[in-house]
Design a protein with these regions (language model features):
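A generic structural motif
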Residues: 53, 74, 123-127
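Short, conserved active-site loop motifs that form the nucleotide-linked donor/cofactor pocket
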Residues: 69-71, 120
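Acidic/glycine-enriched edge-of-secondary-structure segments
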Residues: 2, 64, 69, 148-154
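S-adenosyl-L-methionine
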Residues: 1-62, 66, 77
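Class I S-adenosyl-L-methionine
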Residues: 81-93, 98-158
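Cofactor-binding loops of NAD(P)H-dependent oxidoreductases
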Residues: 73-75, 96
Length: 158
């Protein structure tokens, strides 16, 4: 069976981030889902410091090698964000790109105690549509009530 990937919107993700970076003079990025580091290579490699989370050990090790000046955490970003991890840097650019819904990650960041810059740019990829298209809505917490009432297959109609 082929490996599951969600890079159908990569060029749009990259374009959004490149444009959004222009909104901040000295960006300090927090990337909540580092993945394989492809967006970093295209958008953030010129930045000396930042924060990235990745829960898979093989990926987090690669991210640490890729960005030696960054704080790289092998952790579930929701729990880490709630605990204030990454608060040692004045993050002013938040990049949220989960495979699924972004809402729990955004809640964790904004509910945490951390320094708040005068200006914060937030870029978000919401994978919910892709989850619904592939009949995976049952995985998404925010869809649970609807899945219980309507079933999984009827959540996305083309």
């Amino acid at each position: 069976m082929p490996k599951k990937q969600d890079n159908s919107t990569f060029s749009l993700k990259k374009s959004l981030r490149v444009k959004a970076l222009l909104e901040i003079d000295d960006p300090v990025v927090m990337e909540t889902h580092g993945g394989y580091g492809k967006l970093y290579g295209m958008c953030y490699s010129h930045l000396e410091q930042g924060v990235v989370f990745e829960k898979r050990p093989e990926r987090s090790a690669k991210l640490a090698m890729q960005r030696p000046g960054w704080a790289v955490y092998e952790a579930d970003c929701e729990a880490a964000l709630r605990a204030g991890v990454g608060g040692h840097l004045p993050v002013n650019f938040l990049d949220v790109d989960p495979y699924g819904e972004p809402w729990p990650v955004l809640d964790a960041f904004f509910e945490s105690v951390r320094p708040r810059p005068p200006r914060l740019v937030v870029v978000v990829n919401d994978g919910l549509r892709n989850k619904l298209m592939t009949n995976s809505g049952w995985i998404v917490h925010s869809m649970q009530g609807i899945v219980d009432r309507m079933g999984n297959a009827s959540l996305y109609q083309m």
